[in-house]
Amino acid sequence: MALRTGKELTNETVATIGKFQSGELKVISTGIDHLDDALLSGLTPGIVLGIVGRSSHGKSYDMERIQRHILKTQEDVLYINCNWELSHFKLLLRDISQRTGNSIDKILFEKQTEEQLIKLKEICDDNRTENVLYQNEPVTPEVFKEDIEKVILENPNKKIVVAIDNLENILVSKGSQKESMDALLYQVNRLKNIHPYICFIILNQMNQNYLLRMDNPKNQRPIDSDIYGSDQLYKLCDVLYVKLIPWKLGIHEKFMVFHKDMYSWLEDHKVHGNGNTASFDPYGRAFYFYLKLRAVRDEKNVQDVFIEQMFKKEASEQTTSAPSFTTPLFNTPPVFEKEISLASFEPSFSSLNDPKNSPF
């Protein structure tokens, strides 16, 4: 039965607020400071977080950062990884690579030192946890519903985070891909209300619309219509950001154009133009655009763009040496040989082998 009295629901909510205030219940931090701020401290009960971006722009990387941080800091969280895009083989290799700094081919094909083997075992042991469940292949909305309902029933007192990577990989059982995506989101909207502390992180792609306008700096900021497939995701999410790495799209000199006084908290990343305009320096930077914030601390001063510096230019790349020219200075007027009149010059061709007689 879906109907419940206001008294019953209010009493439950007041009890939950009391647990947060007393410290009995702790919010789930994502480990990403600007994201925790956007969430007003972290993942609270019923939150739906959307992460959108083009392929290879770091959506899965962010989700892996969040998962790693949650498992390291919150033992009472059950994390469900619906890894519909990357197999567990790839996920584990990526984790090892990120935490050791070694490339995947080096991990796979080079003999490890004793020190490296110790680190490798430590990382693998971190992944041998009972607190993570993997849905290691795409499923239909119906199977997703059944699996999550089962977890909810078996874990009424645990905090649960469900992460989907990514929405477009839903297994289509009937109708179109969009219909299946919508069906899954309808289930998320229902499931978030049937457990006292469950949150959802949903990854999705950007569509091709962005590529059609990215050459114009005035139109380079992502908008909600850039989200692939379904506007239901935008409607459902409490917080949604688009992650973009402009230099991967060939945008190297400047990114966006805006009044120089905008984005005052990002002054270190600006490139100032003529007059009152400025742009962002895109080199080695990842941009986070918060397209939706259902709740904010200060409506007047919303900070909805953040930048992470991935790497910086080498010194040799920052300045380009212009060719130099030196004008000779003479202390006395230079003396040139007497000019020969071309009219009186008669070259001899009697012997081309004699350099004295050569006309060249």
Show which residues each predicted segment covers.
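Cytosolic-facing regulatory segments adjacent to core modules
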Residues: 74-156
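Structural recognition of the conserved hydrophobic beta-strand(s) that form the central parallel beta-sheet
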Residues: 163, 198-205
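Hydrophobic/aromatic beta-strand patches that form the interior of the parallel beta-sheet core
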Residues: 49-51, 78-80, 135, 201, ...
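Conserved H-loop
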Residues: 82-84, 202-207
